[in-house]
Regions:
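Catalytic cores of nucleotide-sugar-dependent glycosyltransferases that transfer UDP/GDP/TDP-activated
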Residues: 1-481
Length: 481
């Protein structure tokens, strides 16, 4: 029986191009779809990033289309088979994606031609897939986040996309805080469609990619069940459509790659888990905190992530100071970057408590792995978290999550007092975060209980296997219907 082909359309895919968690999803889920007999194909833009320069990419297709008063040209490149565990294509659109950053210019702001970039990418994908010469025949098109949100509408309602009109579309909201919203003056960037349909791509006076996708995709999901419920109160189009067609929506937890995230085989760790968990923690902690005192006999609480309001990073410094004042017997390590004000506060915290606090401003993948391996707790005070992967990485490496109950954290971190494997708290406040870290330290003092919870946490299966089965079930329903 011929394998069914699902096309994943995304602006990110690890290891090619990564700005956030969407890249990990698009780079991991297809491996598991393939294990279950599917033929996953990934297509992204071609950026001027180091990864692309190192690859064996072959030009596979060239095309063009009219856009406003100009002609947009594009070329599709295919990665040599076997270099990734799935078929990978990237689209080169001269002047649009040949830049050193995926979304932000040198000033840290979004590109001025964001509308042209996103819409030209989507139209290139449609033009390519519509041509039998592409050699790719999809059974389903899976669109990821707002940068691809117009595709479900365009394949159903335009001459340009009519060859794909019978193919079901699936749309995933990775982070509802971001959207492609353009003024009506940009309508000519889209191919022509019946004017009576204009109302269906509009929301609040703008052309709205997320609202369009919610209306026209055959299925819409988010990256955790709880985040779907939370988004209903944040995205008016979602609430409106869910009240009319609730069966069209679902929440599916993201997963992690257990081969990449394995403390026994992790190539990024110099001290892997080869003997006892206690010994593995001890040697990693000693290496990570070589400049601090009291390395091995007191707990380590760490933070890994963006210094952003969403992540609750502004709560960290005052909460850490309170915990140090009240408990003393604890070390902290903070790894991240972002808001310059928070960066400065973290560095000041490190300087003030040089014997207790370590930090690294920036991001280093190998260091992140070592922080997980060294830590006893990972703190996640997020104000919202569509899914969250850090708590999964942490448990895999023997660190319990101290997490605020929002989004995917609510689905994966249950408080230890309720029989769970983490420390949960409810409010995005310094008081609640401080109290949660205090509870974690009391748990750590109960050595027998802590080690049993840690042992159970390390056995948790957060692999993509279960999530892939849920995706496949929905894929099959859409194709059959």
């Amino acid at each position: 029986m011929k394998a069914k082909t699902v096309i994943h359309v995304s602006t990110e895919c690890y290891p090619a191009a990564k700005a956030g968690g969407m890249a990990d999803v698009v780079g991991s889920l297809p491996k598991y779809l393939k294990d279950h007999g599917w033929n996953p194909v990934i297509v992204t833009p071609r950026y001027r990033l180091p990864w692309f320069d190192k690859q064996n990419l072959r030009r596979d297709y060239a095309g063009s289309f009219g856009m406003e008063d100009d002609t947009a040209i594009f070329e599709v490149y295919r990665l040599k088979k076997g270099d990734l565990p799935f078929d990978y294509y990237c689209i080169d659109i001269p002047g649009r994606f040949d830049r050193n950053s995926i979304y932000l210019n040198e000033s840290g702001h979004g590109y001025d031609d964001e509308a042209e970039r996103n819409i030209s990418f989507q139209r290139s994908v449609i033009k390519w897939l519509s041509d039998p010469k592409s050699g790719v025949t999809p059974d389903l098109i899976h669109c990821h986040d707002h940068q691809t949100g117009f595709i479900p509408f365009l394949i159903k309602n335009t001459e340009e996309g009519k060859a794909l009109a019978s193919i079901p579309s699936f749309y995933t909201i990775h982070n509802g805080a971001y959207n492609s919203r353009y003024s009506w003056g940009r309508i000519d960037l889209l191919p022509k469609f019946p004017s009576k349909l204009s109302q269906f791509i509009e929301w609040d006076g703008h052309i709205d990619a997320v609202a369009t996708a919610i209306r026209y995709a055959d299925h819409v999901n988010t990256v955790s069940p709880s985040y779907l419920e939370e988004l209903k109160d944040q995205l008016a189009p979602l609430k409106h459509m869910m009240s009319r067609t609730p069966d069209k929506f679902s929440g599916t937890l993201n997963g992690i790659d257990p081969d990449e995230w394995n403390p026994k085989t992790d190539k990024l760790l110099s001290n892997r888990l080869t003997t006892t968990v206690d010994q593995y923690k001890k040697v990693n902690k000693a290496e990570l905190l070589s400049e601090l005192y009291h390395l091995n006999n007191i707990p380590l609480i760490s933070f890994i992530g963006r210094f952003a309001h969403q992540k609750g990073a502004d709560l960290l410094v005052p909460a850490v100071e309170r915990v140090l004042a009240r408990f003393g017997f604890v070390n902290f390590f903070i790894l991240g970057s972002g808001d310059p004000f928070i960066e400065r506060k973290v560095q000041e915290l490190r300087d003030k408590y040089a014997e207790r606090v370590g930090c690294f401003i920036g991001y280093n993948e190998a260091l992140a792995h070592q922080v997980y391996a060294s830590s006893d707790f990972i703190v996640m005070p997020s104000r919202f978290e569509p899914c969250g992967l850090n708590q999964m990485f942490a448990m895999r490496y023997g660190a319990l999550a101290i997490a605020r109950m929002t989004g995917g954290l609510k689905d994966t971190v249950i408080d230890f007092e309720s029989g769970g494997l983490g420390v949960a708290f409810d409010y995005d406040s310094v008081d609640d975060l401080t109290h949660a870290m205090g509870r974690a330290l009391h748990l750590y003092r109960d050595t027998k209980r802590y080690k049993q919870i840690r042992k159970n946490a390390m056995k948790m299966d957060f692999s993509w296997n279960q999530s892939a089965k849920q995706y496949i079930s929905i894929y099959n329903q859409l194709i059959e219907n």
